[in-house]
From Swiss-Prot:
Belongs to the annexin family. SUPFAM superfamilies: Annexin. The gene is nxnA. Signal peptide: none annotated. GO terms for cellular component: cytoplasm; endosome membrane; nucleus; phagocytic vesicle; plasma membrane; vesicle membrane. GO terms for molecular function: calcium ion binding; calcium-dependent phospholipid binding; phosphatidylserine binding. This is Annexin A7. It comes from Dictyostelium discoideum. Residues 16-130 have a biased composition (Low complexity).
Length: 462
């Protein structure tokens, strides 16, 4: 399914703006106030923001950089200053979509028993990703002031390939009669976003042509959609996905939920800025026109900053678990506002700890089951998505991919969106997929897709 906060948070600095590295595009205020993300050693003992009671069948989680650097949201006291608590599992791992380098100095929290039905997993730290913001020299093609590895809060990697040569290969693949689709796949599926952005620049500088427009004129169908997605800035891509989900008859609530639930405060702030500049209407206003009732309130809250501290306050966890019980299963009727308030404002590690606390003390079943019995429709889908993502983010994305290919036909837009936006997390997502479902992700793509589109997807996930 990656935001500078709305209030009290200074805009980012050293992060490239829409359109250009280091130079703000008209309409986007320059980011200020964040120092370059350099020199942070990997977090020791307290892996990035997760490790809450894992769900059954989910593979060991591999860490996402922690969502750090923001004070707790208004109305909630800072969750700081608590000594290491006995009774919580080691917290680790949200995908490096979150835009923060790993932090150091949090002792491990141990001993929290897993939710009933969920085996303990103690997710190890993230493996296989380059260190965030610790470049050995500045890669070719990066403008001064760019935070290497991140753009608008999204993980984009660093430039290690010869992007000028890649631009030449792409031009040759589309020049003349016919198109060499294999070369398009070979280059674009095997470069990170920072490299693909630089390839676009090199292509434009050398040939005075727009690479995306050339791709559109030379390809078609899902193959074209996926290539264009690979070449679109991450925040802009999210904006267009949300806008498309709201367009036409009906609203694709699942697309909106999958994006809003999984994006950080930094990412969400850019999504809101870009949406307003591009579509002349605030994201909040657009969502209000597409939804109603409690679901509308949930979407509004999901666009606001949530606490991103990795520190858990056990007393607040116990109180929230009790409050959720009293708001749902412990009374006649349901207090929807209480569920929305807690699940949209608390940190993801906190929510996972609440889910574990809930199962210990209330009805001996999960918070997800409680939500399922108390809610219906889109509000139920949204609340369950929050808890599921908090408990196991890689498993959450694996489930989205599986649903996109399950049953008759394939939801190509969902498949493209998830594969492209989570390609840097694919090793862990593929492991989760193989554990949760009968087949591997590659096997199911092979069975459900065809032609150059299938080849492109298989190259991306490999």
């Amino acid at each position: 399914m990656s935001y500078p906060p709305n209030q009290g948070y200074p805009p980012q600095s050293n992060s490239p703006q829409p359109g250009q590295y280091g130079a703000p595009q008209q309409g986007y205020p320059p980011q200020q106030g964040y120092p370059p993300q350099q020199g942070y050693p990997p977090q020791q003992g307290y892996p990035p923001q997760q490790g809450y009671p894992p769900q059954q069948g989910y593979p060991p989680q591999q860490g996402y950089p922690p969502q750090q650097g923001y004070p707790p949201q208004q109305g909630y006291p800072p969750q700081q200053g608590y000594p290491p608590q006995q009774g919580y599992p080691p917290q680790q791992g949200y995908p490096p979509q979150q835009g923060y380098p790993p932090q150091q100095g949090y002792p491990p929290q141990q001993g929290y028993p897993p939710q009933q039905g969920y085996p303990p997993q103690g997710y190890p730290p993230q493996q296989g990703y380059p260190p965030v913001g610790v470049p050995v020299g500045v890669p070719v093609g990066f403008a001064p002031g760019m935070v290497v590895g991140y753009h608008q809060g999204y993980f984009v990697g660093t430039i290690t390939h010869d992007c000028k040569h890649d631009a030449e290969v792409l031009r040759k693949a589309m020049k003349g009669i016919g198109t060499n689709e294999s070369d398009l796949i070979k280059v674009l599926a095997n470069r990170n976003w920072a490299e693909r952005e630089q390839i676009k620049r090199e292509f434009s500088a050398k040939y005075s042509k727009d690479l995306i427009q050339d791709i559109k004129s030379e390809t078609s169908g899902n193959f074209e959609k996926c290539l264009v997605a690979l070449l679109t800035e991450p925040a802009h891509f999210d904006v267009e996905q949300i806008h498309s989900a709201c367009a036409g008859a009906g609203t694709n609530e699942n697309t909106i939920i999958e994006i809003l639930v999984t994006r950080s405060n930094v990412q969400m702030e850019y999504i809101k800025q870009i949406f307003k500049n591009k579509h002349g209407k605030s994201l909040k206003d657009r969502l209000e026109s597409e939804a109603s009732g409690d679901f509308k309130k949930l979407l509004e809250k999901l666009t606001e900053p949530r606490d991103e501290s990795p520190v858990i306050n056990p007393m607040q966890v116990s109180k929230d678990a009790e409050d959720l019980y009293k708001a749902g299963e412990g009374k006649i009727g349901t207090d929807e506002k209480e569920f929305i308030k807690i699940l949209t404002s608390r940190s993801l590690p906190h929510i996972a700890a609440v889910a574990s606390e809930y199962i210990k003390h209330h009805k001996k079943h999960s918070l997800i089951k409680a939500i399922d019995s108390e809610f219906s429709g889109s509000i139920k889908t949204g609340l369950i998505a929050i808890v599921t993502y908090a408990l196991n983010p890689y498993g959450y994305f694996a489930e989205i991919l599986n649903k996109s290919m399950k049953g008759a036909g394939t939801n190509d837009n969902k498949l493209i969106r998830t594969v492209v936006t989570q390609m840097h997390n694919m090793p862990q997502i593929k492991t989760a997929y193989s554990t949760l479902f009968k087949n591997s992700l590659a096997h199911d793509i092979q069975a459900d897709c065809s032609g150059d589109f299938k080849k492109l997807l298989l190259d991306i996930i490999s």
